[in-house]
Amino acid sequence: VLIDTYSTFNFYFAYLCSQLCRILKLKYVPILHGGNLPNRLKKNPKLSKDIFNKAHKNIGPSLYIMASFKGFGYDNVVYIPNTIELKNYPFQKRTFDNIHLLWVRSFSKIYNTNLAIEILSLLNEKNTDATLCMVGPENDGSLQKAKKYAKELNVEVNFTGKLSKQAWVTRSQDYNIFINTTNFDNMPVSIIEAMALGLPVVSTHVGGMPFLIENGEEGILVAPNQADLFVKAIKQLQANPDETYRMIANARKKVEMFDWEIVKKQWFGILSG
């Protein structure tokens, strides 16, 4: 039984599923999605041990999560990265005459949505032609707060709401920089997808991001909640296209290893064990 496991309320759902599997004598495999799961290990050590120590295997989709769990004494963690079907993400070479920012995530407090709007405002203040598209569903009221914040800062943001995978991939053709503003993260599929599409990524330096993106080689990582550092990184990408193209090529090469045709062999090994 595969159990998607997150750090929020879903953690308790995962706990109940794991205990039911134990009663029914079924092997279960938690898939460790939440970038804030290490804090959950600290806050709920007993429940965590009941879930993870008894698991057939725990799947860490990032080296960050695997290292964090091993730091708490969990040795039955296997690294299998989040996957994409690479054929669905056509690589596109972009130009950077103007800045067109793309943000893709659910509108949740932990993803610090307002920072993206602040970045756009700061770019406008510096007389840099820039646009921002924010793709994702409402989760905890953050979408409405973001719309209100955009009005307060007098900036125009394209809020699309939730889009299908194909729809946002198609829309991404009109944008040239991907920003990730989160305060907590693991190994987000949206970042992998952006790297596959040829979008240079500027992200906060949190959670699993340094394990996914080597700073200055495959994208740019900055401190969280610092709009000025994002703007500096964005303008750096614009001013140095050759260096930007080098990072884009490195990023694409890395995520080619996350293609399902490659990763599925690891899954088959776990599920047949």
Pin down the residues of each PLM region.
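Nucleotide-activated donor-binding/catalytic signature segment of Leloir-type glycosyltransferases, i.e.
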Residues: 145-163
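Conserved donor-binding/catalytic core segment of Leloir-type glycosyltransferases
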Residues: 93-124, 132-135
